[in-house]
């Protein structure tokens, strides 16, 4: 089992250096999260590779964040492992911090859907900022930002969502004009409204 785990760590994290430490971190995370070591490796490798840091420190950080997410949200290590890959590359490229990413999962799972639904919803939010509609482009510029990515990096994920939702409400325009997908709208309305305090507390 340990040898097999080492092979999986090397495969998942792209090298053998420090593999034993990575496996130990994943095994500890799995034990804490009541998951298999395979689940933990799949989850930590998806996130750490997406963020470009597969060090033992990064693996431990992701494992800790995932454990807290499972405790505070309505999800599991396997569900997170199967879902995070949907949104991590986009989140990382736009400067969304790991803490923000996991706080969304902890807040929205069980509220707007399961882990895969929440990951899809968050991806929709980020896509609406990365490839904005005409209305979203005007909004971003009117707030003094060059791009949606710059907005996220300066205001944070929730701050950005709150600004967009508030602007839509102030203009009387449906949120759909700014965020085209119903999935994105679902998460945005939750994080800017009923779940705003919950997200802030979990962050």
PLM features: residue spans?
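Amphipathic alpha-helical interface segments used for oligomerization, scaffolding
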Residues: 1-202
């Amino acid at each position: 089992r340990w040898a097999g785990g080492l092979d999986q760590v090397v495969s998942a994290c792209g090298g053998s250096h420090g593999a034993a430490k990575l496996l130990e971190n994943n095994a500890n995370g799995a034990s804490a999260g009541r998951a298999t070591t395979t689940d933990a490796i799949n989850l930590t490798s998806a996130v750490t590779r997406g963020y470009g840091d597969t060090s033992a420190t990064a693996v431990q950080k992701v494992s800790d964040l995932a454990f807290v997410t499972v405790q505070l949200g309505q999800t599991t290590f396997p569900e997170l492992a199967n879902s995070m890959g949907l949104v991590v590359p986009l989140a990382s490229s736009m400067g969304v911090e790991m803490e923000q990413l996991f706080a969304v999962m902890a807040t929205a799972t069980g509220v707007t859907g399961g882990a895969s639904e929440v990951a899809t919803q968050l991806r929709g939010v980020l896509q609406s900022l990365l490839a904005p509609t005409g209305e979203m482009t005007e909004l971003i510029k009117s707030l003094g930002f060059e791009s949606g990515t710059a907005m996220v990096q300066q205001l944070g994920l929730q701050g950005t969502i709150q600004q967009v939702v508030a602007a839509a409400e102030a203009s009387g325009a449906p949120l759909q004009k700014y965020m085209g997908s119903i999935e994105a709208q679902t998460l945005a309305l939750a994080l800017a409204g009923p779940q705003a305090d919950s997200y802030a507390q979990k962050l």
